[in-house]
Amino acid sequence: MGFITKAIPIVLAALSTVNGARILEAGPHAETIPNKYIVVMKKDVSEESFSAHTTWLSQTLNSRLMRRAGSSKPMAGMQNKYSLGGIFRAYSGEFDDAMIKDISSHDDVDFIEPDFVVRATTNGTNLTHQDNVPSWGLARVSTRKPGGTTYYYDPSAGKGVTAYVIDTGIDTKHEDFGGRAKWGKNLVDQMDEDCNGHGTHVAGTVGGTKYGLAKGVSLVAVKVLDCEGSGSNSGVIKGMEWAMMDASGGGNGTAKAAGKAVMNMSLGGPRSEATNQAAKAISDAGIFLAVAAGNENMDAQHSSPASEPSVCTVAASTKDDGKANFSNFGSVVDVYAPGKDIVSLKPGGGTDTLSGTSMASPHVCGLGAYLIGLGKQGGPGLCDTIKQMATDAIQSPGEDTTSKLIYNGSGK
């Protein structure tokens, strides 16, 4: 397991343009969901105009259902509506070809793209320390050279910061979380549990007491992937919207302020303009977002959200500072982090050892929380801080790819 995705080198291509609206298609290897689409509005569309558009949509769908009653199985219509920071407005649902044609001719629509399957991405002077660390990644991020067995960190340890784990859920009762993990939102099923294990492993690296980088951080589970580690692109965007709202105080207000929040997305799929715009809206709201680069050993520009420039895209390194053979690479990668044979938590207690850029990304998310706890500025600029602090360590990082490996600035 690891980066749960089957992202392949796919670039969305415009099929047609009708009155300015683009109808996009995913490449031949994307696992599209029949008749499911994401409709994204133009950036200058107001909330009032968006509401008027969705009213028109409902009325048009109802009118068509009445005309063809009994002739065929009706489409579900709009199922999700999104509004992220007044920047990204969109909706998703089930529509037939005729309805998509009508939607594409609407002046307020920017583009339409098919919904598809997304998967998790698995295959100081006042320092304290943790000796004989259970996972090599902890020692590696706090020392300038490989081979260490001690994790050096400031005792602030990310206290006062909230980390949103957008994944398969978290076993919030696992003893290593020490009561700091809670459920936020479940957008997949009725089971507030991690029946896959991926999300718990990721959360353990972010903020477990023994296995995490930010040992004092608060953790929030946002479940967008099922027991098989898969979900829909539209569902992932809905989870992103909820997390952003909560981090900004619009939901339960767990984080109190966006600048005290970090997010991790160890998941991905083919490049999606809708996903990238949603990720940018999160960054624009002042929230630090770490994402997995992907596990296909290809250029990460073909995967989302990894290809979004405003997020912190993370490739996976090995114990001897090499590029993990599965890790994606390319100019969109911001940093490397440990991602091979990472020990972290599993649901029900105990641990598991997993590899993937899914395991690398939470090292960066945890480091982000740790640095905010030390007083560093949060938001997308935090990725620049992390890059500046990183060591030039990765051997043969890949074509047009950084050799920077994350470092927490311990001085060791």
UniProtKB/Swiss-Prot annotation:
GO molecular function terms listed in the Swiss-Prot or TrEMBL record: serine-type endopeptidase activity
Active site feature: D167, H198, S358
Propeptide: 21-127
SUPFAM superfamilies: Protease propeptides/inhibitors, Subtilisin-like
GO cellular component term, pick one: extracellular region
EC number: 3.4.21.-
Residues bearing attached sugar chains per UniProt: N252, N264, N325, N408
Peptidase S8 domain segment(s): 135-412
Domain Inhibitor I9 per the UniProt entry, residue ranges: 36-120
Family matches, as Pfam families: Inhibitor_I9, Peptidase_S8
Enzyme class: hydrolase
Main location: secreted
Keywords from the named record: Glycoprotein, Hydrolase, Protease, Secreted, Serine protease, Signal, Virulence, Zymogen
Gene3D superfamilies, per the entry: Peptidase S8 propeptide/proteinase inhibitor I9, Peptidase S8/S53 domain
Signal peptide annotation: 1-20
Highest taxon, organism lineage: Eukaryota
Keyword Glycoprotein listed: yes
Any single biological process term in GO: proteolysis
InterPro entries listed in its UniProt record: PCSK9_ProteinaseK-like (IPR034193), Peptidase_S8/S53_dom (IPR000209), Peptidase_S8/S53_dom_sf (IPR036852), Peptidase_S8_Asp-AS (IPR023827), Peptidase_S8_His-AS (IPR022398), Peptidase_S8_Ser-AS (IPR023828), Peptidase_S8_subtilisin-like (IPR050131), Peptidase_S8_subtilisin-rel (IPR015500)
Function: Secreted subtilisin-like serine protease with keratinolytic activity that contributes to pathogenicity.
Family per record: Belongs to the peptidase S8 family.
Protein name: Subtilisin-like protease 6
Organism of origin: Trichophyton verrucosum (strain HKI 0517)
